[in-house]
Amino acid sequence: MIKFRRFPYKHNLAFIIFIGILLSIINALWAFLLSIAETENGNFVVVSLSMALGFLIIPLSLFLLKHKRIYLNYYAIATGIAFGVANAVLISIFSYRDSVVVYSLITPTIIIFVLMDMLINKTKIKKRNAIKFLFGGMIATIGFVLLAFNSLNLSLITTYDVVIAIFLIVIYGMASFLLTQTGLKSKSNYSSITTIAIFEIITMLLFIPFSGYGFSFAGLQFSFIAGLIVSIGMIIGFLGYNSIQKSSHAIAYSSIMYILSEMETVFLVIFYSIFVERLSVFAFFSIMLIIIAVWYLSKESDTAFH
């Protein structure tokens, strides 16, 4: 079994970048499988719960094997609740919107992540350099917005789509920040991940009255596998968080890891463009801006944080 706190890549930027890119691939596969599950099943709560159960199995099993007590982590509880709400809403719209379109609409979550980082960790970010941190987040945000223009037909976007997109941008940005704080402060990784999964399930149960009462097993194998995959991704992500715990680079490097993990939209757009032959110059500009944001944050990590 992996010993998290003895992992050798201490404060290694290359390792953080590798983890971020790996997470983006995992997230892309997760979104693809969930969109299939919702299309085949149609009941977003059933699909959400199936995914959450798949997410729970691996960390819970590893936690029970270690026979350690549960550490009550309020960040983990808040993370589970936030992801429960966000994922339930996201899955509910997969039945009538292409997953690429949905992800393109909600890509600017990084700006919420950065703003929360600045608010919660304001004592750890040098005041005179806070604007630099925000600037790095804005570069990445612009990159993701440009990426959205590659796959969206704006004439088909409704006011309802915009409202839902804004809600998901805020809630996913908050959830991702809370997840990062959970990883950076965690005393027991499997306990924290298990707590997230349990509270995600509890939150999703609250959506049952909005789902109707039809039940079907159709497509649930895809959502369950998606849950298994994302649990592996979260365990891998905690390797990254643990490698920078108590480091002066923690804020910048965790932001870099999050920015890169959000690049699943890049993979979804490229995959989508292969079939519709619609890969515009926006996609290349967006990727370049994301790379620049990563470089800028890594460069400023030596001066802007303490």
PLM features: what roles do these ranges have?
Residues 26-29, 33, 69-101, 140-142, ...:
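Specific transmembrane alpha-helical segments of multi-pass solute transporters/efflux pumps
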Residues 15-22, 41-63, 135-142, 163, ...:
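Hydrophobic alpha-helical transmembrane segments of multi-pass integral membrane proteins
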Residues 1, 128-151, 281-301:
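Hydrophobic transmembrane alpha-helices of multi-pass small-molecule transport proteins
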Residues 24, 28, 32, 80, ...:
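Hydrophobic/small/kink-forming positions within alpha-helical transmembrane segments
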Residues 49, 88, 101-108, 183-199, ...:
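Helix-helix packing/entry segments at the starts of transmembrane helices
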Residues 109-133, 263-285:
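C-terminal transmembrane-helix exit sites in multi-pass transporters
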Residues 1-46, 81, 85, 89, ...:
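Glycine-/small-residue-enriched transmembrane alpha-helix faces in small-molecule transporters
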Residues 17-20, 71-81, 127-140, 161, ...:
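Cytoplasmic-side transmembrane-helix entry/capping segments in multi-pass membrane proteins
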